Amino acid sequence: MRGPTGYALATRGVTECRNGHQVSLTSGTGLHRSKLPLTLWFHAAYLVSTLTPGISALQRQKQLGISRYETACQLLHKLRSALVAPDREPLHGEVEVDEGFIGGPEEGRPGRGAETKSLVVFGVEIIRYAAPDPRNPDDPQAQVEKLRAGRVRMNVIPDASTETLMPWCALNIEAGSRVITDGWPAYNGLEKLGYAHRRIVQSVKGKKTGAYLPMVHLIVSNLKRWLLGTHQGAVLPRHLPAYLNEFTFRFNRRFWRGPAFHRALGLIIHAEQWPEYDTLYRVAKGGIGAGVHPSSPANTRPKAGTHGDTAGPLDVVVT
């Protein structure tokens, strides 16, 4: 770092060349000019990347010994903003895609009418594997096929239209993959994008929706439980995209805690500049990933049976 003409300034912890240019250990990284000790940054990155239930700003303040709650909040916001790799590999293979509303209920405005709810699109890789058949414990050759979730992607979206969902799929799912959705007509253009599309139309009233797209509903359930348990459900719509980043990062690395910490450090170091709070949580006026919650009826999906829930040639009817 010092170079042939540099020398260390003991009073400032930087190296200066003969031309007066100063370089520190954190120059060119996301930690440049931070007033917090590097050990505190590393400890915070470890907590956010490895703890299964996550950690709230108040918990972080207590564990790290930070005197001001606002400092803990800013630290957590900056870490979340760096947890998404710009060159991450898209989902591939067999992928379930669906949307759901995330957020707390409002008094007098239940369900999708609540303005605190945000529409989120989910993509989940499906991994199929063989497991011993519990019905034949004495036969070691008897096996059954089971499913588990692979990697996930999720983003806040302004609506569930074709104009929103098709670009999201093209950006997050590798061409040639098999995409499984429900009967919502906004997905009808997937074949034109090069995907093998399987539509599952719910045909049995009273059957749990999780039986049709099980991995997506598992992820949605885990996300809601995490937001409710760790953050008591107190997540503002403008903050939700950053919380989705944190959940996605940790879920995709749930089997590799050590590498997750090193990956988080790498993303933090290579973040050239931290976004300011208003930039990170700016509420855009639409587009993929915008922090806009659908408060108008035009942005909600019709009830089942009113948007083409009839089986076509490519439909798979689950009974």
Regions found by a protein language model. Give the residues of each.
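Residue-level recognition of single "structural anchor" positions
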Residues: 1-319
